[in-house]
Amino acid sequence: VLVALSAGFWWRARTGRAKLVRSGEIVDLGKLKATRAGQPVTSFGKKATLLQFSTEVCSICVQTAKYFKELESKNPDLTHIEVDLTDRMDLAAHFNVMQTPTTLILDRTGKVQARIGGAPKINVIQQELEKLEIK
């Protein structure tokens, strides 16, 4: 019981926190096949992009997307892209997505700067966006 309890506390402490990504990977929008209003997404945000990986059965993903869309509406330099991984195991494997939502924070060139597994904490998102000059 103690082992399970400890594992639960460890998992909860890690969820929603940003991890610095040093891979230098630049996300290929063509491979994501993300759309907005039926049109392909062809550009990143002027300063930052929140790339959210979701699935059909993820209730937290809906809340996360709503929060990110609200942030996007308040800041013209920020773009939110949501990709449903339900039928995209290729992307889940490529980006090593083990839970949804998983959010990648990209700079203006699409380079991955940080990664958040699980429901993102608001203060963590704000801190990461400030690093990319988003207030």
Give, region by region, the residue ranges found by the protein language model:
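Non-catalytic, surface beta->alpha helical segment in thiol-disulfide oxidoreductase systems
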Residues: L106-K135
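Thiol-based oxidoreductase modules, predominantly thioredoxin-like and allied folds used
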Residues: P76-D90
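Conserved redox-active cysteine motifs that mediate thiol-disulfide chemistry
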Residues: T55-K66
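N-terminal targeting signals for export/organelle localization
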Residues: V1-L32
